[in-house]
Amino acid sequence: MSAQLPIIVVGAGTAGCTVVSHLANNTDHPILVLEPGGYGNDDDPQFLNLSDTDLLRTSDDGYVQARAMGGGSAVNGLLLTGDEPEHLHGLTRYAHAQDIGSVGEALLALGGRFSRLWWNGGRWNPGRAVRHLMEENRVSWLPRSVTELLLDGDRVIGVDCNEEPLRAAAVVLCAGAIASPGILLASGAQKLNPMIGVGVQNHPTITAQFSLGAHLPARFDTAVVREWSTSAGGQMLNVGYERVAKNLDGVGALSVSLMNPISRGRVEISSNHMPHADFQYLAADEDLFNMVEGVRDLIRLLVDGKFTDDPESITVEGRPLVDVSAWDDDDMREWLRRSVRGVSHAASSCAQAVDSAGRVLGLDNCWIADASVLTHVPTETPAASVTMEALRIARNIGESLS
């Protein structure tokens, strides 16, 4: 690396790889990416084959986050429920009948549709481009986790990796909507910017499981979705899963998620500086109402659909379907408050902590370019929104440092 200080990009997930690729191709600055994760298999269409690898990390409170070059795009379920980003045209495709199994077929019969997939001859993973840049010596990589920022007053001058200081010309946080604010909080930056970590969201989700019996394997673990709206305007998403785990082909699943939640929480750090998110799922009455309606609809799908030949095998978050079906709305609300879960879609934890260019307010020389800065959790699977926002902020960074 030259004597010139590098731009340090913290995290090589979907956002980080997008930022690295743009800056490496559009600035003269050396680029150093810090990412503790390794590489996955971009040629395996069944994402659950990655579920027991070191490419995933589960926090003490159960939140699952990628730990891989390419981040969530290296390990996700491949669903792109929204539009294909213009700058990635041709790198995705729609699923078709040869891709799905019995669960997808049952959901199609109930109004589902084939989803667009982050797949076209292989998984779209922005980590591939970064890997090529590394092979060409245009980008440097260290397998490090950043613990905090190095500050000189309100100016960010580098990062600390477990007492290994690294100086930087600029720092771009792309560690995700929990880890990025966590790094800022561990650095004491909340004294300069009290909105760090405030407003985090996720998609509240309930999942049913059922026995599949004899069935043919599907090419993709999930490829069919169903979108609908509640009477109150809740945007709901059903996803069918052809299996629930790598070595559990005999069990399928059907989930329902609220895609436009109102409830917001915050990211905080523990006494040992580990970040965690309190999402405040269903804190807003509107969200609770929509999820009650969502579960009622899920029950109807499970009863009317041909998901299983063994109705007694159906459970909803571990409770027999017959029990859940019998509850009145009060019982359902009480159960939902205890049982609702999230998915790996954390967003918006720093939307109020940055300016329109992605600069962290109160700090000089520091940007955030990941899902943290989205104004709300996307109403579709989030990778498209994340990569578009990361590219926008990367362009801003490139212009400001040129």
Question: What are these model-derived regions, one by one?
Answer:
Residues 33-34, 141, 368-369:
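Short hydrophobic beta-strand that contains or immediately precedes a catalytic carboxylate
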Residues 1-90, 191-224:
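N-terminal glycine-rich phosphate/pyrophosphate-binding loop and immediately adjacent elements
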Residues 77, 85-156, 162, 309-340, ...:
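Conserved redox-cofactor binding core of oxidoreductases
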Residues 37-41, 152-153, 177-178, 189, ...:
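Acidic glycine-/aspartate-rich tracts in secreted/extracellular proteins
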Residues 44-109, 113, 123, 254-276:
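Redox-cofactor-proximal catalytic regions of oxidoreductases
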Residues 8-10, 34, 146, 165-185:
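Short hydrophobic core segments
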Residues 278-289, 297-402:
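C-terminal lid/capping helical subdomain adjacent to the catalytic/cofactor pocket in oxidative enzymes
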Residues 18, 170, 181-263, 289, ...:
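Mid-to-C-terminal "cap/lid" subdomains and adjacent gly/pro-rich loops that border
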